[in-house]
C-alpha cells in the first residue's frame, strides 16, 4: 500500500527551463543597463563562473544552487559594486521566473487527488530551501505538502542514499510504501529504486534514457502527462 508520494520540484511540478531562460534574459538586461556590461557577455561570464563554483565545491553541495553566491562572485570578478546590484540582480531573476512559470499541466490536480485519497505528499529537491518554499506557495502546492527534503538540509544531492533515506524517514513508512516522482532519471528514478522506493519518471519532454546504463531488474513507471499519475499510484495502493 502506498502511503506517501514524494515529488521533485524543478522540471517536474513546473517547467524550470522556461522561467530560467527569461530570468537570465532579465539579468542580462539589467547588467547592460545598470552596469554597462553587454548582456551576452554577462551571461557567458555567469555560466563560466557557475562551472568554476561547481568544480570548486563539487556536485554534492547545495551551495552550487545559490544564485546569490554566483552573483556575488560574478560582480567581484567584474569589479562592480556588490550593493545594490547583488540583490537587484537576484530579484530580477527570481521575480521573473516566478511570474511567468506555472504548474505543469495536471500536476496540481494529481497532487490534490492523491491527497484526497489519504496519500501523504512529500517533496525531495536539490536546492536551497527558501526559494523552493516560494515556488510551492506560488504554484499552489503548499497546502498539500506534509514533508520537505532539500539537499541543503540533507547535506547531499540526489541520488545520495542519505538524501533518499531522509525522505523515507520523514514519510514515517517503509521505503516500499513510498513513490518518488521526478524528471531526472539518474537522480529521481534510480536514486529512489536503490533506496527501495517505487519510482515514476516524469518524461514530458521525451528525454532519452542515459546511455550505457544497466537497468536489469529496475522496474519503474514512465509517464508523459500528470493525468497518468494518480490512477497508477492508486492502483498500487
What does each model-found stretch correspond to?
Residues 2-105:
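N-terminal helical cap/lid subdomain that shapes the substrate entry/recognition surface
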Residues 76-79, 117, 196-197:
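Short glycine/proline-enriched coil/turn segments at helix->beta-strand junctions
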Residues 1-5, 18, 33, 40, ...:
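Asp-based, Mg2+/Mn2+-dependent phosphohydrolase catalytic module
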Amino acid at each position: 500500500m502506498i502511503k506517501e508520494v514524494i515529488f521533485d520540484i524543478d522540471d517536474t511540478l513546473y517547467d524550470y527551463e522556461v522561467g530560467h531562460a527569461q530570468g537570465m534574459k532579465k539579468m542580462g538586461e539589467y547588467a547592460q543597463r545598470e552596469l554597462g556590461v553587454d548582456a551576452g557577455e554577462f551571461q557567458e561570464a555567469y555560466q563560466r563562473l557557475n562551472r568554476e563554483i561547481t568544480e570548486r565545491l563539487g556536485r554534492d553541495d547545495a551551495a552550487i544552487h545559490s544564485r546569490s553566491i554566483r552573483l556575488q562572485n560574478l560582480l567581484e570578478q567584474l569589479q562592480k559594486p556588490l550593493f545594490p546590484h547583488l540583490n537587484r540582480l537576484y530579484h530580477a531573476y527570481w521575480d521573473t521566473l516566478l511570474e511567468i512559470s506555472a504548474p505543469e499541466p495536471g500536476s496540481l490536480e494529481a497532487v490534490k487527488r492523491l491527497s484526497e485519497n489519504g496519500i501523504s505528499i512529500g517533496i525531495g529537491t536539490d536546492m536551497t530551501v527558501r526559494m523552493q518554499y516560494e515556488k510551492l506557495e506560488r504554484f499552489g502546492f503548499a497546502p498539500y505538502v506534509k514533508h520537505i527534503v532539500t539537499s541543503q538540509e540533507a547535506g547531499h544531492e540526489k541520488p545520495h542514499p542519505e538524501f533518499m533515506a531522509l525522505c523515507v524517514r520523514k514519510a514515517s513508512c517503509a521505503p516500499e510504501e513510498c513513490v518518488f516522482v521526478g524528471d531526472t532519471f539518474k537522480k529521481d528514478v534510480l536514486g529512489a529504486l536503490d533506496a527501495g522506493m517505487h519510482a515514476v519518471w516524469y518524461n514530458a519532454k521525451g528525454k532519452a534514457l542515459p546511455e550505457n546504463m544497466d537497468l536489469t531488474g529496475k522496474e519503474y513507471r514512465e509517464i508523459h502527462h500528470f493525468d497518468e499519475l494518480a490512477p497508477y499510484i492508486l492502483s498500487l495502493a
